[in-house]
């Protein structure tokens, strides 16, 4: 395989790419489509089409740059034995094979039976169990608890998604900060939603995306599991060629992997309040609807607000920027996706999270993220999980749990410090040493007082600027008030009347 980088400079170049797409037996596999003129696109070209694609681009005078696919070696690990337990740190340094993943979750469940239930929701096409883990203490009220649902790896080449899910599992089981929350809510994690495709990508084709089913009269294997859900199935962003990477299957729910996920989620749909599907790559938090551009749910502002809180939390941890965008507007319209379906059955907060990296700029990594990056990506996603937990607690139960004391153990000094909800940039807001002004003139003391007030005012305003939600501090012993800030590129934020000191006006 080679990665072919193209950068259309005119509409004629865009037409050339579309023409190339039509001339091949199967649609071009875009790792990243060009979103307009002078925006780079990256094609994954298999050996059988490589010479043809290069010749076509050269004949049409479209500049391209081709490089061999960079695939770093992954450390092999033999199957676990009872006397050779998996060190939890290995999930942050290795891409584990399916068998190791399942033995890891089995041992987590066995070690923490009071808060973890494990269940096989279905077997894959090749008879591999697809397991889900449900974290939470039994309800003390007899009523069902709100649920956060997270699944990973429906696209098998997106290896980092499996690692993040396993890291979440390890943290929920072993980090004591989560125990109070687990008394109030449940968290479900499906760490490997496409085990057949994953093992095929490990041993045969590193960039394999689909499942491994083969349907009658289909000459190629696999269906795109994220085009197989029963919501506007087959309407946009699909190809009916079974060899295509975005083949939606011969019918909706044709894949056992999708059937199992749908069946289990449907049985708990009244309690699931948050749905997350982990993917890569792009560093994006995507919200519905994805089946059509410029089409949004009625509560899109709530989706944006919580998405921005997740993005802010990730950025606070280590500086990584995740954009919060509509999936169809940002990428392309694609129907039959899991987040659209989840939203359609009444789950309020439904997102697809495209993990790191942001692009293909470093060694063409994209999906092939080096194992050295696993720890960084996993750790920076933990604050986003905490946002979802607090959102579920506050919105659906009227509760709150402090997670911040253990949330940022290695918080970078170059990023703002956290004190509850108010953010203080460290340099600007450092408390000055008291030296006194005895002996200075009245004018000097007055100027100093004005400068101190101005400094305090800037501190509060900069705190608001640093993060995409605004905080108004009532200096006369009133509560801290948070208001949502809408993406400035899309819509103007709803303003709250304030006086000249930044305080919320009464009435």
Predicted feature descriptions by range:
Residues 1-417, 422-432, 436-441, 446-449, ...:
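M14 metallocarboxypeptidase catalytic domain recognition
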